Amino acid sequence: LASSVSLRATPLRAANRRVASKSAVRSAVVAPRAMASQDELKQMTGYKSVDDHVESGMVVGLGTGSTAYFAVERLGQKLKSGELKDIIAIPTSERTREQAESLGIPLCTLNEKSVLDVAIDGADEVDPNLALVKGGGGALLREKMVEVMAKKFVVIVDDSKLCKGLGPGFPLPVEITPFCHMHTLRTIAALPSVAGSEAVLRMGSSSTNKPDGDEIAVTDNGNYIVDLHFKEPIKDVNKAAEELKNTVGVVDHGLFVDMSYQVIIAGKDGIRVAGTGGEPAWW
């Protein structure tokens, strides 16, 4: 059964890399304040990622999204207070660049610094192997380019993003070239590894897969996004990643596989940390 195609707008390894192995996914728990709101939990997660993983003199990748926002905020605070010095950061979107500049965080690009000490970003889905779906905010290409070059990629999410299998909980974004975009959309929809999904061209703002306009969404790179909606988990994530990447017209996709070093997770019971060195993933 081939994937269906729709034009409707619907809600939609670098050298020296350290990642969490399947046999060594661990967890730890940090209790939150009583009755913390969702934003407060996101803040705690973002702050913890910087407190635990960023040291003076580092090159840091800055993610995009509502949780990554707090990591950028925390980095700015610690630079302003003098607790951190000599930091150079690489943003993964224009939104993040603007936030970082407003906080006085020194920035560069991969052209100046090709290897990062750590990158911090959110995710839309996380499976028990710490594979991710990312790109709901439309920054998947820059996110992957930056984060694949980090020695440590730290993921920050709330527990609603945890899943048994990638796909059903959040559409998988695929960034494509504008040239003959409908041909590319149909080609993606026909791939065996994504059979049964519905391919939807993102409309309105590229920063959300919820329709908010009548024009085709355009990324920071001038490309379009196809969101793949799944009813069942992706059977072979690695195969899907390979087939999508090898499709002519596809720039990149939102499957981040074998990249996560640690996942910091906010939930009603506190902040839990999954990664090498603790208990197996609990979800």
Role assignments for model-derived ranges:
Residues 59-67:
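Glycine-rich beta-strand-to-loop/alpha-helix junction loops that act as flexible
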